[in-house]
């Protein structure tokens, strides 16, 4: 499991359940566990990247689900409403949970539970992993990246 620091205030399982209902989704259990332990934040021990055989990209921070630590930090709900509802540049079946250094989201697919990177500039949804657990397993320190 990953460790996040500089997290926002804790959320309860009840609060997570209410957000799932309001968005009409079910979050993966591993993602819920991260939000319950540390509500968003940056990865401990410096910069990290997701790396697979076909793709590599940095991870700036994991989005909090509620209760931001300070103003200017978007929550999952805020980011979803901005990109899906207001700007219509992200498919409604994607839930953002983290962002890269350019502000582009890593998302969980509501229909399949897979993890995607959404390149908003090029309008691309890049399939990364079949599930959140597999994605977490491929996060490495930046200095170990090839």
Residue ranges with predicted function:
Residues 117-118:
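Short, compact, well-ordered microdomains
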Residues 125-146:
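Compact, glycine/acidic-enriched structural inserts
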Residues 104-109:
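Short, surface-exposed beta-strand/loop micro-motifs that present aromatic residues
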Residues 1-102, 143-146:
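A surface-exposed partner-binding patch
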